Amino acid sequence: NYLWSETFDAVMTDLPVLQDEITRHIVMTLIGNIEQNAIRDSVTKSEVTAYADTIRARQLVYRMRDPADTKTARELFQKVLRTDSASTTALSGLALTYLADFLMMWAEDRNACIPQAAHYASHALELDPADSLAHAVFGITYLWRRHYIEAMAHLDQAISLNPNHADALAGRGLVLIFTGEPESALVEFGKALSHNPFPPSWYLWGLAIAHYNTDRYVDAVQTLLRIDNPNRFHRRVLAASYAQLGDIGQAAAERDAVMAEVPNYTVNDSRRFQPYQDPQNIESFINGLLLAGFLD
């Protein structure tokens, strides 16, 4: 094992630009030191560029702050694949962009995201069965296709390959929620958050559902209030939680915000979307939505 250290002078005024500068510096330093002999013999300028593009793309997709992140990351991964169609890092990263758009509720056509994510993750695993990210993405796509055993198997494999894989741990939390084990899901989300203390909102959405399904409605509300820009999916859980707490005023406010975004929504839409193995396990959430004033 090696410990690398470096000093870096910068003005803390434009963090995105600074991040790009540090990324380029790290890429060139690592290539120059760790892979010096290989580069001398074989690495071309285009390969160095592809490596930098991959690191930048993964930085964006893991950040998951807004739809532009996954869009730019996808373009960078596709650029890498045009020069190296067998890049498993780019393939699994591309799969993650589609999964992120699905989980973050950013895609206009969410139904297309899961097949796309599964396609690229499967291709990555064909080339490299030890790709932890591909296993994690593939596992979560299996969940929304209602293949629960396969979902957990791939997520377990991802964690076996990388015990610190926060997305895989959160993915396990989702599987446990939808297979009726919310208490165990809370443990997995706790692990995920310990590895990623600045999580994408889908971690918090899943954690809130686990709290809700264990009758911890205050915890569900507090979790969702950590999300900077809640969307209709987050607000539905908020509305149901407030309603279960007897705060009908707040529940109605969240309901109205949801209906302003999707005027034709009914609680049956949630029944269809959420992949519960046992349909009875969603009924507590449905009851909360009805208490909040949503239509059946």
Locate each region found by the language model.
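Short coil/turn linking the two alpha-helices of tandem helical-hairpin repeats
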Residues: R58-P67, A95, A100-A107, R145-R146, ...
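Flexible helix-coil transition and linker loops at the boundaries of alpha-helical arrays
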Residues: D41-K45, R82-T89, S122-D131, L193-P200
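Short, charge-rich amphipathic alpha-helical segments embedded
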Residues: Q78-E108, H234-R235
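Alpha-helical protein-protein interaction modules
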Residues: P67, R110-N111, H119-S122, A136, ...
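Alpha-helical tetratricopeptide repeat
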Residues: E47-Y62, S92, S132, A136, ...
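Catalytic-center loop of serine/cysteine hydrolases
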Residues: N1-L76
